[in-house]
Amino acid sequence: MSDWVNVAPQDEFAPGEWRSLDVDGTRLAVFNVGGNYRAIEDVCTHDGGILTGGSVEGDEVVCPRHGARFSLITGAALTPPAYEDVATFAVRVEGGLVQVRDNRWD
């Protein structure tokens, strides 16, 4: 995926909300953290489960199963039991739409 993909209209994506979507076989999670949009791969590197549904505390998401924390800015695994980072993705607002892009393969 190297093109921008629409996630949601900005006016329907309030602070504190998240969206999960599948783009070209990759499950992404996009978070609105106080008006700043962050996107990571929606998978806990500890056990492969999804991160959406876990709590968001500042710029971190907490895995709902075992409590591993990941940075929504860098994707870094911050606490055990996860030790591997998750991928992050570029996010922008264009024409009133929140969009995400994966440039890992450009």
Regions found by a protein language model. Name each.
Residues 44, 63-66:
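Short cysteine clusters
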Residues 80-82:
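Short Gly/Pro-enriched turn/cap motifs at secondary-structure boundaries
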Residues 1-58, 71-72, 76, 85-106:
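N-terminal pre-ligand scaffold of iron-sulfur
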